[in-house]
Swiss-Prot record:
SUPFAM superfamilies to which the protein is assigned, alphabetical: Glucocorticoid receptor-like (DNA-binding domain), Homeodomain-like
Gene it is expressed from: lhx9
Record feature DNA-binding region, as residue ranges: 268-327
Identification of the protein by name: LIM/homeobox protein Lhx9
Occurrences of domain LIM zinc-binding (ranges): 71-132, 133-194
Family matches, as InterPro entries: HD, Homeodomain-like_sf, LIM_Homeobox_TF, Znf_LIM
Length: 331
């Protein structure tokens, strides 16, 4: 933003070269000196109007002023007839018209101003509306400051701490997130285990074939993808596989006993399925006729026996394997 001159009034520059001038009672040497002085002043005034100005380390030249096309103010839209005006964001402004759109502070005496989406801001309001803010303390983050990122949130280094114990988390530490709150690994596991104990319906899970939803979020904070199959660690309170890097568990590897409860220190066991006599007879006679039933056949058989399709598939595989083995025995 610069203050530049404007040749709005011809009377402001009294010394201009004329095509013909009359001098009476003045010697030739004096006339020559007067003409040289007038020419020097005229060139000095023109050079001040045409000089280039330096803005933000790049050269910006003042637009040429066409007397036939008046210069208009970008703020009020009126004609600029003042001797001085402001040049900001490649537009001309009255001294009184360049102001912050939020606090209405006149920026005539300010060294800098900021423009965004066609609006002018002072320095304070621009940083208040445009700068990234820490998700924990909600204060602004400068462009030169080191930050920690998790999902779409940005944190100061000192603000990236566990919500429960306030432990500072650094690069490489494993952490979890729930509802945009950051937890260390220990407290995140305790939080997830508590949610599972409150929300899981073991009867419904067994009826649907088992399966536990993926953990909300779990990361080691490095932002890199682990190559190969991630290692798993058994949680002592649940039969859930918590991966060291990414969240989630395999629903095909988890079975819960709906009729038996276990103390927190004991691992859960796979549920053993027991059959009644009429169920065994029905399955045996059915699989003797059809060794490879499709989904529709299994559905009908499940309705007859009262068992799930998953149990029937397991019994089908075991029965088929034993049948094949018997046929391959050497007499």
């Amino acid at each position: 933003m610069e203050i530049v001159g404007c040749r709005a009034d011809e009377s402001a520059y009294p010394f201009r070269p004329a095509a013909a001038m009359l001098f009476h009672g003045i010697t030739g040497g004096h006339i020559q000196g007067i003409m040289e002085e007038m020419e020097r002043r005229s060139k000095s005034a023109d050079s001040r109007l045409a000089k280039s100005i330096q803005v933000n380390s790049r050269e910006t030249r003042m637009p040429s002023l066409n007397p036939e096309k008046p210069t208009l103010c970008a703020g009020c839209g009126g004609k600029i007839s003042d001797r001085y005006y402001l040049l900001a964001v490649d537009k001309q402004w009255h001294l009184r018209c360049l102001k912050c759109c939020e606090c209405k502070l006149t920026l005539e005496s300010e060294l800098t101003c900021f423009a965004k989406d066609g609006s002018i801001y002072c320095k304070e309001d621009y940083y208040r509306f445009s700068v990234k803010r820490c998700a924990r303390c909600h204060l602004g983050i400068s462009a030169s400051e080191m930050v920690m990122r998790a999902r779409e949130s940005v944190y100061h280094l000192s603000c990236f701490t566990c919500t429960t114990c306030n432990k500072t988390l650094s690069t490489g530490d494993q952490f979890g997130m729930k509802e945009n709150l950051v937890y260390c690994r220990i407290h995140f596991e305790l939080l997830v285990q508590g949610d599972f104990h409150q929300q899981l319906n073991y009867t419904e899970l067994s009826a649907k074939g088992g399966g536990i939803a993926a953990l909300p979020y779990f990361s080691n904070g490095t932002g890199t993808v682990q190559k190969g199959r991630p290692r798993k660690r058994k949680s002592p309170a649940l039969g859930v596989d918590i991966m060291n890097y990414s969240s989630g568990c395999n629903e095909n590897e988890t079975d819960l006993d709906r009729d038996q409860t276990y103390p927190p220190s004991q691992k859960t066991k796979r549920m053993r399925t027991s059959f009644k006599h009429h169920q065994l007879r029905t399955m045996k006679s059915y699989f003797a006729i059809n060794h490879n039933p499709d989904a529709k056949d299994l559905k009908q058989l499940a309705q007859k026996t009262g068992l799930t399709k998953r149990v029937l598939q397991g019994e089908q595989c075991s029965g088929f394997n034993s049948h094949t083995t018997r046929r391959l025995k050497i007499p």
